[in-house]
Amino acid sequence: MSKQSQFVCHRIKQDGPEPGEKPAGPMVEWVVRRIRARGAPPLDEILGPDAVLVPLPRSAPFPPNQKNVLWVPNRIAQALVAEGWGHTVEPMLARATLVQKSAFAESGQRPGPQAHLDSMTVTRGLTAPERIVLIDDVVTKGATLLAGASLIRGVFPGIQVDCFALVRTLGLQPEVDRIVDPVVGTIARNPWGGADRRP
């Protein structure tokens, strides 16, 4: 597996510190700024100043009355809004019950879309947004994103729902050509109840 991409992914999931800067700032903000500065036309199809960004919940419910819990998708959403790639951040999705972390699950044992559907709740705001973009830190198969989109569409029928992940896995490739390589693809439920991501 690519050492460089592993390093970047780990830094993103811990949100810091950014490389090469003294004092170091948050990694998420650094990555989003870098993508924005380089230009990423594919992302302009998904993100924009009219989009309401909804961060995906963690694998476990937030501890009651505990503040400052690391929630990377929310930090990504805030960084995207700061760069003009979103209108506002609305945490509509919450985790009601624990699911296994995909990062620690064996291949074939990751929670599927239905497990995520059963473990999440959605809260409707006062007004219906015109379009929503779900935000995640890392996408593997896309089961969590697929479940989140289903829940949002159940509350807001007919609304446009897109998804964005800062990192997409590429399997066991020995090395990657580019760390920054935005693409637009699809995530769909397969006949076996799982999620398929292309590319």
Predicted regions mapped to residue ranges:
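A structural signal for isolated positions on well-ordered beta-strands in alpha/beta enzyme cores
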Residues: V52, V133, D162-F164
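Hydrophobic anchor at the start of a short beta-strand
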Residues: H87, I132, I159-V161
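C-terminal substrate/ligand-recognition segments
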Residues: V69-A77, E83
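Active-site-facing substrate-recognition patch
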Residues: M1-V52, S59-L70, L93-P129
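A phosphate-binding catalytic loop at a beta-strand-loop-alpha-helix junction
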Residues: L134-G148
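Catalytic phosphate/metal-binding cores of nucleic-acid and nucleotide-processing enzymes, i.e., regions
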Residues: K3, G84, T88, T123, ...
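Short beta-strand/turn micro-motifs composed of small residues
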Residues: P55-P57, D136, A165-V167
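PRPP-dependent phosphoribosyltransferase catalytic core
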Residues: L146-P199
